[in-house]
């Protein structure tokens, strides 16, 4: 499932998870819609808290049996935990076969089996194929599954319409970084920082590029900017530690 990226969506999700965990700790009933439970499960899975994710999905399907959002999350959870056959079985049980999220799930299952052409055909039938959100989902799907050429086809699909859109620029930067076009990626991340200087993900994009180039001082500086934007950015702390280790300056980590 797509992750919550906007600040307002993230804040709403944090509140939702807090309410859920408080109710659970107090053994108190808390009614939540299926999509809310799916979002909570998705977050747990993204944090690799697979048992908690399964607990939410199991509870959700008891009060919302057969719900598509929850079944999609169940299938992805099986994928995350290397249970491919169970994921396929759940995907096959979903009745809303024309739903875009269902098609994305089934495409991932096909790619897991090396069936690129079948996945390409399925994704070509997406009703919202020209929407930016869909393009982003498909590009990352292909990149994650190791098909950069297929990802490039979908990236190009949105260029004429979305070239100046910040989300599309971020997608382009991530694609360039993922395909080792580091210099071009740096140019895009800097453009994004000019647009949104307090977005830590853009700074982290720069960090990774500089680290690959072994420009460690620049990587550390970018880490500091990422932490200035979000002092809870664990990835920035981790990369900063890697940088100091690389410089054989391990004492600095503990000072």
Regions found by a protein language model. Give the residues of each.
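Short coil turns that delineate tetratricopeptide repeat
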Residues: 65, 97-99, 129-131, 162-163, ...
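Register position in tetratricopeptide repeats
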Residues: 46, 80, 112, 144, ...
């Amino acid at each position: 499932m797509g992750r919550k990226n906007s600040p307002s969506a993230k804040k709403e999700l944090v509140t939702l998870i807090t309410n859920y965990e408080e109710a659970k700790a107090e053994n108190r009933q808390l009614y939540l819609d299926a999509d809310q439970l799916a979002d909570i499960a998705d977050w747990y899975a993204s944090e690799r808290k697979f048992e908690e994710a399964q607990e939410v999905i199991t509870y959700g399907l008891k009060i919302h049996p057969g719900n598509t959002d929850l079944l999609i999350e169940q299938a992805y959870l099986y994928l995350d935990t290397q249970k491919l056959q169970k994921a396929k079985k759940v995907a096959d049980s979903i009745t809303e076969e024309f739903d875009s999220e269902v098609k994305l799930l089934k495409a991932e299952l096909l790619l897991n089996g090396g069936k690129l052409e079948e996945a390409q055909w399925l994704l070509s039938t997406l009703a919202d194929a020209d929407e930016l959100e869909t393009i982003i989902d498909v590009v990352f799907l292909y990149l994650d599954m190791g098909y950069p050429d297929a990802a490039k086809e979908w990236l190009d699909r949105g260029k004429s319409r979305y070239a100046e859109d910040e989300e599309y620029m971020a997608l382009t930067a991530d694609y360039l970084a993922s395909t080792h076009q580091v210099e071009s990626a740096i140019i895009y991340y800097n453009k994004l920082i000019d647009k949104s200087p307090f977005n830590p993900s853009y700074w982290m994009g720069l960090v990774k590029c500089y680290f690959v180039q072994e420009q460690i001082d620049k990587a550390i500086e970018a880490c500091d900017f990422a932490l200035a934007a979000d002092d809870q950015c664990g990835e920035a702390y981790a990369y900063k530690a890697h940088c100091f280790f690389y410089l054989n300056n391990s004492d600095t980590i503990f000072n």
